[in-house]
């Protein structure tokens, strides 16, 4: 059975929802899934004053454990068209894994959340994939295998590179039912392709 990690960073809970949906989809695809988050770097008093969702139940991951999984889906909030610094800080600690080649041929996929529709989602998806490619990981994007993203009948996130959602600047917009379904599809797709590669 495929072992998958869904690893995320979420300040306000948007990516937490997307990560949970991706994990559900991966389980539907036959994977054994672990859901974890990266450590918060913002001081607790600042996070509380900024109304961060600090009661997230997912345990904190450690960089060394990434090698334990066949596939890793990363979900991250974005900052100025890049992954959030919390995720970048976590990934920057994987140099030892890189030196050992511990993630070579593991499967990787990415999802992001932005404040605005044009907040750099595609750039954040691709730049996060770069991190995975430096490790020799095999990227499985959402892609146009997910035909639902071809429609223009409703505003929704998504790109061929990975699933996205928009939170609005104040965090008031929550992931839509369609976006959560899209994340489930991405999780299921990654699980099924990983099973073919590592089964």
UniProtKB/Swiss-Prot annotation:
**Which cofactor is recorded for it?**
FMN
Keywords in alphabetical order: Flavoprotein, FMN, NAD, NADP, Nucleotide-binding, Oxidoreductase
Please give the start and end residues of each transmembrane region: none
Has the keyword tRNA processing been applied to this entry? no
Extent of Polar residues compositional bias = 163-177
Domain Flavodoxin-like, chain residue ranges per copy? 4-190
Catalytic activity reported: a quinone + NADH + H(+) = a quinol + NAD(+); a quinone + NADPH + H(+) = a quinol + NADP(+)
Could you tell me which SUPFAM superfamilies the record lists for this protein? Flavoproteins
In this chain, NAD(+) is annotated as bound at: 12
Q: Name one GO cellular component term.
A: membrane
* MF terms (GO), sorted A to Z: flavin adenine dinucleotide binding; FMN binding; NAD binding; NADH:ubiquinone reductase (non-electrogenic) activity; NADP binding; NADPH dehydrogenase (quinone) activity
Q: Which domain of life is it from?
A: Bacteria
Region annotated Disordered, chain positions: 158-181
Going by the record, the broad EC class of this enzyme is oxidoreductase
Q: How is the cofactor bound?
A: Binds 1 FMN per monomer.
Its Enzyme Commission number(s) read 1.6.5.2
Q: What InterPro entries does the annotation carry? A: Flavodoxin/NO_synth, Flavoprotein-like_sf, Flavoprotein_WrbA-like, FMN_Rdtase-like_dom, NQO
Residues given in the record as FMN binding sites? 10-15, 78-80, 113-119, 134
For whether the record's keyword set contains Flavoprotein, the answer is: yes
Positions that bind substrate: 98
Listed PANTHER family: FLAVODOXIN-RELATED PROTEIN WRBA-RELATED, FLAVOPROTEIN-LIKE PROTEIN YCP4-RELATED
Q: Which family does it belong to?
A: Belongs to the WrbA family.
Q: What is this protein called?
A: NAD(P)H dehydrogenase (quinone)
- Organism of this sequence: Brucella ovis (strain ATCC 25840 / 63/290 / NCTC 10512)
């Amino acid at each position: 059975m495929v072992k998958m990690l869904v690893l995320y960073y979420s300040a306000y809970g948007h990516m937490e929802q997307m990560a949970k949906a991706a994990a559900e989809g991966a389980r539907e695809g036959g994977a054994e899934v672990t859901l974890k988050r990266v450590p918060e770097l913002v001081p607790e008093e600042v996070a509380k004053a900024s109304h961060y969702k600090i009661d997230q139940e997912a345990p904190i991951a450690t960089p060394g454990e990434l090698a334990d999984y066949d596939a890793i889906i990363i979900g991250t909030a974005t900052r100025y068209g890049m992954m959030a610094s919390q995720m970048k800080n976590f990934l920057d600690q994987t140099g030892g894994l890189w030196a050992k080649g511990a993630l070579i041929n593991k499967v990787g996929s990415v999802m992001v959340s932005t404040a605005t529709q044009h907040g750099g989602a595609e750039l954040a998806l691709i730049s996060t994939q770069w991190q995975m490619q430096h490790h020799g990981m095999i990227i499985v994007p959402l892609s146009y295998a997910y035909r639902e993203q071809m429609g223009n009948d409703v505003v929704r996130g998504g790109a061929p590179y990975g699933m996205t959602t928009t939170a609005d600047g104040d965090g008031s917009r929550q992931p839509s039912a369609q976006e959560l379904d899209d994340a489930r599809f991405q999780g299921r797709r990654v699980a099924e392709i990983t099973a073919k590669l590592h089964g």
